[in-house]
Protein backbone atom coordinates (compact mmCIF):
# COMPACT_ATOMS: atom_id res chain seq x y z
CA UNK A 1 0.00 0.00 0.00
CA UNK A 2 1.83 3.10 -1.20
CA UNK A 3 0.09 5.51 1.20
CA UNK A 4 0.89 3.30 4.19
CA UNK A 5 4.51 2.99 3.04
CA UNK A 6 4.81 6.80 2.73
CA UNK A 7 3.21 7.31 6.15
CA UNK A 8 5.52 4.74 7.76
CA UNK A 9 8.60 6.20 6.06
CA UNK A 10 7.72 9.65 7.46
CA UNK A 11 7.01 8.19 10.90
CA UNK A 12 10.41 6.47 11.10
CA UNK A 13 12.31 9.40 9.60
CA UNK A 14 13.22 7.76 6.29
CA UNK A 15 14.10 10.95 4.46
CA UNK A 16 13.66 11.16 0.71
CA UNK A 17 11.49 8.04 0.46
CA UNK A 18 9.82 7.54 -2.91
CA UNK A 19 7.12 4.93 -3.64
CA UNK A 20 9.41 3.10 -6.06
CA UNK A 21 11.75 2.27 -3.18
CA UNK A 22 9.18 -0.16 -1.79
CA UNK A 23 10.48 -2.59 -4.43
CA UNK A 24 13.95 -2.48 -2.87
CA UNK A 25 14.35 -5.44 -0.54
CA UNK A 26 16.00 -3.59 2.36
CA UNK A 27 13.53 -0.71 2.21
CA UNK A 28 10.55 -3.04 1.95
CA UNK A 29 11.67 -5.02 5.01
CA UNK A 30 12.41 -1.83 6.97
CA UNK A 31 9.02 -0.30 6.23
CA UNK A 32 7.07 -3.53 6.76
CA UNK A 33 8.81 -4.32 10.06
CA UNK A 34 8.47 -0.72 11.23
CA UNK A 35 4.75 -0.66 10.45
CA UNK A 36 4.28 -3.93 12.33
CA UNK A 37 6.15 -2.47 15.33
CA UNK A 38 3.92 0.62 15.26
CA UNK A 39 0.86 -1.65 15.14
CA UNK A 40 2.21 -3.70 18.06
CA UNK A 41 2.73 -0.49 20.02
CA UNK A 42 -0.76 0.72 19.13
CA UNK A 43 -2.32 -2.53 20.36
CA UNK A 44 -0.12 -2.76 23.48
CA UNK A 45 1.87 -5.75 22.25
CA UNK A 46 -1.13 -7.83 21.20
CA UNK A 47 0.17 -9.96 18.35
CA UNK A 48 -3.31 -10.99 17.17
CA UNK A 49 -4.55 -7.39 16.96
CA UNK A 50 -1.32 -6.16 15.34
CA UNK A 51 -1.42 -8.94 12.73
CA UNK A 52 -5.05 -8.12 11.96
CA UNK A 53 -4.16 -4.42 11.66
CA UNK A 54 -1.24 -5.22 9.36
CA UNK A 55 -3.55 -7.14 7.05
CA UNK A 56 -6.86 -5.25 7.27
CA UNK A 57 -5.87 -1.82 8.58
CA UNK A 58 -6.10 -0.74 12.23
CA UNK A 59 -9.72 0.40 12.34
CA UNK A 60 -11.13 -3.06 11.77
CA UNK A 61 -9.39 -4.79 14.71
CA UNK A 62 -10.23 -1.77 16.87
CA UNK A 63 -13.88 -2.54 16.17
CA UNK A 64 -13.54 -6.35 16.26
CA UNK A 65 -12.05 -6.31 19.76
CA UNK A 66 -15.20 -4.80 21.25
CA UNK A 67 -16.91 -8.13 21.88
CA UNK A 68 -16.37 -10.38 24.88
CA UNK A 69 -12.84 -11.12 26.03
CA UNK A 70 -11.67 -14.32 24.34
CA UNK A 71 -8.49 -16.34 24.11
CA UNK A 72 -6.64 -14.93 21.10
CA UNK A 73 -6.77 -18.18 19.12
CA UNK A 74 -10.55 -18.26 19.57
CA UNK A 75 -10.87 -14.54 18.82
CA UNK A 76 -9.04 -15.09 15.52
CA UNK A 77 -11.83 -17.47 14.47
CA UNK A 78 -14.36 -14.64 14.88
CA UNK A 79 -12.66 -12.29 12.40
CA UNK A 80 -15.35 -11.67 9.76
CA UNK A 81 -12.98 -11.37 6.77
CA UNK A 82 -11.73 -14.77 5.61
CA UNK A 83 -8.46 -13.40 4.22
CA UNK A 84 -7.62 -11.61 7.47
CA UNK A 85 -8.79 -14.53 9.62
CA UNK A 86 -6.50 -16.92 7.70
CA UNK A 87 -3.60 -14.43 7.74
CA UNK A 88 -3.83 -13.90 11.51
CA UNK A 89 -4.03 -17.63 12.22
CA UNK A 90 -0.99 -18.33 10.02
CA UNK A 91 1.04 -15.51 11.58
CA UNK A 92 0.18 -16.62 15.12
CA UNK A 93 0.96 -20.26 14.37
CA UNK A 94 4.25 -19.43 12.64
CA UNK A 95 5.26 -17.05 15.43
CA UNK A 96 4.78 -19.82 17.96
CA UNK A 97 6.62 -22.39 15.82
CA UNK A 98 9.61 -20.11 15.25
CA UNK A 99 9.74 -19.12 18.92
CA UNK A 100 9.99 -22.83 19.76
CA UNK A 101 12.77 -23.32 17.20
CA UNK A 102 14.72 -20.31 18.42
CA UNK A 103 14.35 -21.10 22.11
CA UNK A 104 14.67 -24.88 21.82
CA UNK A 105 11.56 -25.24 23.99
CA UNK A 106 7.94 -25.93 23.08
CA UNK A 107 5.74 -22.85 23.13
CA UNK A 108 2.15 -22.57 24.26
CA UNK A 109 0.04 -20.67 21.76
CA UNK A 110 -2.39 -19.75 24.53
CA UNK A 111 0.25 -18.32 26.86
CA UNK A 112 2.13 -16.48 24.09
CA UNK A 113 -0.95 -14.79 22.67
CA UNK A 114 -3.08 -14.05 25.69
CA UNK A 115 -6.60 -12.82 25.18
CA UNK A 116 -8.37 -10.18 23.12
CA UNK A 117 -11.12 -7.98 24.46
CA UNK A 118 -12.27 -4.39 24.67
CA UNK A 119 -9.60 -1.75 25.22
CA UNK A 120 -9.69 -0.22 28.69
CA UNK A 121 -11.60 3.07 28.60
CA UNK A 122 -8.60 4.94 30.01
CA UNK A 123 -6.19 3.46 27.45
CA UNK A 124 -4.91 6.24 25.21
CA UNK A 125 -4.53 5.64 21.50
CA UNK A 126 -0.82 5.97 20.77
CA UNK A 127 -0.82 6.43 17.02
CA UNK A 128 -4.37 7.36 16.26
CA UNK A 129 -3.25 8.17 12.72
CA UNK A 130 -2.01 4.60 12.06
CA UNK A 131 -3.28 3.89 8.53
Language-model features and meaning:
Residues 2, 24, 63, 77, ...:
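Generic structural "secondary-structure junction" signal
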Residues 78, 94-131:
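Gram-negative outer-membrane assembly/targeting C-terminal domains
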Residues 45-104:
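Catalytic and substrate-binding regions of cell-wall glycan-acting enzymes that process beta-1,4-linked
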Residues 37-44:
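Hydrophobic alpha-helical bundle architecture
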Residues 33, 68, 119-120:
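Short alpha-helix boundary/capping motifs
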Amino acid sequence: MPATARWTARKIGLDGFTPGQINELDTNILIGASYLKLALDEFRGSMPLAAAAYNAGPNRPRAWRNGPTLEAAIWAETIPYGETRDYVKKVLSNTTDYAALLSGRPQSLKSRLGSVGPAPVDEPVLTKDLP
